[in-house]
C-alpha cells in the first residue's frame, strides 16, 4: 500500500517547483552568502504586512507558539514554518506506522520528500483558509470574498517561499536547514528584544520599559529606594525581568554541556589493516527534531481548538479540547488556554504557577517527556539513522566495528542507537520543562531549539574549517 500511495502522488510531485541540486561543490563563502540571502528574505517577509486585513489587534491565539514557529503576526510570515513542520510530522507518523513504506533507494527517498512538499503546500492553503475564515483579520463577511482570496493567496505564496528557502539550504547551497535557521533567528531576536526593548508599557507601578536590562537602569535612575528598584528589576511580574535572563543563560549553559555527552564506538577498516576510527553516538542523537515535532503537534491542536471555540463556544466537546481567555497584561493582546486539554498541554507561566496547580505541571511534564521520547525513537526509523541504516553506511565505507563481524554490527548498534534516541528525546523534553519552570525567555522549547541549532552551526563551521585547512581559507 505504501509504495502504491507514493506512486499515486508521483505525477503531482513532478509539477512542484524544485531547487536543483548543485552540479559542483559549493564553497563555504558561497554557502554563507546563500544563507545570508535566505535570512534576509525571511526578515523582510517578517516586516511586510498582509494587504487587505482589516485588523490584527485582537487577541493573538497563537502568541505562545510564534517564537518557535518563526511566525510574525499580520505579516507575510504569519504561518512561519508551521506548514513544513506539520507536513513532516504527518509523513513521519504515516511512515512510522508503516502506512507508507519508504524504501532505501534514492528514488523512494526523493518521492517521499516530494510528498512532504506536496502536503506542505496543501497544509499552507488549509491554514490560510482557516486563519481568514475564523476572523483573525476581521469579519470575512465585511471584508468580502475578493479580499479574503487575496489574503489567502499572499499566505500561500509566502508559505511556498519558505518551502523553497528550506529546500535551497537542504540541497547544499547553504548551511544547515532553512527550518533551523529561521527558528534560531526568531528565538534569538526575541531574546535580544526582551532584554533591550525600548518600548514602554503602562503598568500598575507606572510606566516601565519592556526590556529587562533597560528597565534595570531606568528603575535605578528613577526610584529613590534602590533596593526596591533592584527587587523589581529582578522579580517584576508580567514583563521580562533579570531572573528570566539569568534563567535563559543558565539553560544555554546546561544544554551546551549536555551536547558533549556521547558514546564512541570503535571501528576499523575492513580493507586496510591498522586503520582505526570511532563512530560517535551522541546523547542528543536526533538533535532538536523531537521538540520541533512536538511543537507542531501542539500548535495544530491550538489551531483546531481556537477554530472550534470561535464557532461553537459553549459546546461540551469543544470545551473539553480547550477553553480560552484573552489578556493584554504586560504586552500584546494574546489568547491563552484556561481549561481543557490545551491548558494541560501548555507550559505553566512560572514556578509560582507550578505550585498553584501541581496537577497541570505533572501532566505537562509527562506529556513533554513522553512525546519527545516517542518522536525521537520514531524519527530514526524514517530518517535513515536507525541501526540498520548506520550499519549499511559503515559497510559501504568498508568499515566494521572492532570485535564484531559485519553480520553482528546491526545487533550491536541496536544496543545503543534506539536507547540514545529515546533517552536523548527524554532529556530534551526534561530540559525544556526545566526552562519553562525557571521562566526562561522565549519558552523552554524555544531555548532548547535555539541552543541546539546554534551548536549545529558551530559544528558545521568547525567541519568546514578543518576541510579548508584554516580560518582564512573559509572566506578568502
Curated annotation (Swiss-Prot):
GO biological process: pronephric nephron development; protein targeting to ER; protein transport
Xref: SUPFAM superfamilies: Preprotein translocase SecY subunit (SSF103491)
Domain of life: Eukaryota
GO cellular component: endoplasmic reticulum membrane
Main location: endoplasmic reticulum
Transmembrane portions of the chain: 34-53, 77-96, 118-138, 145-165, 173-193, 241-261, 289-309, 355-375, 421-441, 446-462
Keywords tagged on the record: Developmental protein, Endoplasmic reticulum, Membrane, Protein transport, Translocation, Transmembrane, Transmembrane helix, Transport
Gene3D superfamilies for the chain: SecY subunit domain
Topological domains, Lumenal: 54-76, 139-144, 194-240, 310-354, 442-445
NCBIfam families: 3a0501s007, PRK08568.1-5
Protein name (Swiss-Prot/TrEMBL): Protein transport protein Sec61 subunit alpha
Protein species of origin: Boreogadus saida
Gene: sec61a
